[in-house]
Amino acid sequence: MSTEPGYASPVVNVASSLPRRAAASTVLIVPVVSTGDDDKPGAVVASAGSFLSSDAVAEIESGLRALAATGGAEQLHRLVVGSLPVSSVLTVGLGKPRSEWPADTVRRAAGVAARSLSNTETVFTTLAALPGEGVASAAVEGLILGSYRFTEFRSAKTAPKDKGLQKITVLATAKDAKQEVAHGAAVATAVATARDLVNTPPSHLFPDEFAKRARALGESVGLEVEVLDEKALQKGGYGGILGVGQGSSRPPRLVRLIHRGSRLAKKSKQAKKVALVGKGVTFDTGGISIKPAASMHHMTSDMGGAAAVIATVALAAQLQLPIDVIATVPMAENMPSGTAQRPGDVLTQYGGTTVEVQNTDAEGRLILADAIVRACEDNPDYLIETSTLTGAQTVALGARIPGVMGSDEFRDRVAAISQRVGENGWPMPLPDELKEDLKSTVADLSNISGQRFAGMLVAGVFLREFIADGVGWAHIDVAGPAYNTGSPWGYSPKGATGVPTRTMFAVLEDIAANG
């Protein structure tokens, strides 16, 4: 999907059996389960073993016995199995046996397996043969996302010596296997595109360049694209975007990407319209209210919401969802300088609301407010906004769980879908009394409250002020989940994760199917 240098997803196909003779550096990934007894070895899952001869299964289980491998969740063991036409077999543990497997269990197992591979160009897997809804798609997603690497800025001295995973063959015979596998590959590639954008350093991805990449990606899949430069923003009255960007020598942008999918619907007049909004602060120093230096370099990820939105709307066009999807993406760099906005300044948001800027490091909500008002002018049925908005999200929910706020019914719908796809968004309230803390003596609103507590919810309450009446909306705060500062886990690498791309696309699919 990406039109710029970055991660090239492996080629994915489906086969009903292993080849008679496989190429060198070929690995077969086989799921195994535990017996529940730590003294007994793991066993090959029966459905996954249906693609293997009884001799091959016996050889694998003999190897597990020799290694005292129990089949515990995400345990990996490499075996040489002479009766199979592959260089080696990689078993991945799933834990206790189940009659049906949750998709994210399979996705994580595939991701762990993929991350362990080196000098491996071709993978076969029987993971898709596991019983359970969506497991074939999940297996492919996990393999692609687990094998992700970002090497664009590495010289020959430090770049990986191998090519990385080039080809995935999914062993499956189900009627819809090819369709499910293709869907999983498309979704994972979109997530990889979002990761590439977030991992690109701010020296190379600033508002104008970000807008150019969004345009190139959008046009490559047939989206309508509109880019507003600083002059157009000034003329249009986008005070929030301009205020945040005025301290930088690299001026802000507003990008609009439009997928007109309703024309693909059987009943086009009944097709829903969805607005997507994503925070695109390409680097956030905090401005005059400057951040501590120790972790400021992580603020290369402060456009993670924008990256996910751009990848999502492009995927909607690529897979031709029969609904209208309109992405509105504000892009700015928040820098301290003689021209930067100051604490105490008052700016006028797009649409006329005035805001007192009490803290220049609460800048994301200022650019989002402009974008939300503009997005609501399109009269959407639903609006999904996502942003790396508050450190309070991580304090409240940790580094892996997004906070989901918004109108109650749609918030709960988005959170449930997020949990289903394994991104684990959690519904949070927006108490009305928090609005009192956003009162200003000189403007309509302040951009922060005077309280230490509930920072994630306060930001959501601020954004709610700009949502048009009657629009079902959700705000997904991914301050922690969008960027993994710790060790890799599951199918998540260190650095950009691409969250919440899969959540947003799954919500779009649900709206297309159910309204």
Curated annotation (Swiss-Prot):
It catalyses: Release of an N-terminal amino acid, Xaa-|-Yaa-, in which Xaa is preferably Leu, but may be other amino acids including Pro although not Arg or Lys, and Yaa may be Pro. Amino acid amides and methyl esters are also readily hydrolyzed, but rates on arylamides are exceedingly low; Release of an N-terminal amino acid, preferentially leucine, but not glutamic or aspartic acids. It comes from Mycolicibacterium paratuberculosis (strain ATCC BAA-968 / K-10) (Mycobacterium paratuberculosis). GO terms for molecular function: manganese ion binding; metalloaminopeptidase activity. PANTHER family: CYTOSOL AMINOPEPTIDASE, LEUCINE AMINOPEPTIDASE-RELATED. One of its GO terms (cellular component) is cytoplasm. It holds the Pfam family Peptidase_M17. The gene is pepA. Its EC number is 3.4.11.1, 3.4.11.10. Its main location: cytoplasm. GO terms for biological process: proteolysis. InterPro entries: Leucine_aapep/pepB, Macro_dom-like, Peptidase_M17_C, Peptidase_M17_leu_NH2_pept, Peptidase_M17_N. The active site is at K291, R365. This is Probable cytosol aminopeptidase. Binds 2 manganese ions per subunit. HAMAP family: Cytosol_peptidase_M17 (MF_00181). NCBIfam families: PRK00913.1-2 (NF002073). It comes from the Bacteria. Mn(2+) 1 binds at D284, D361, E363.
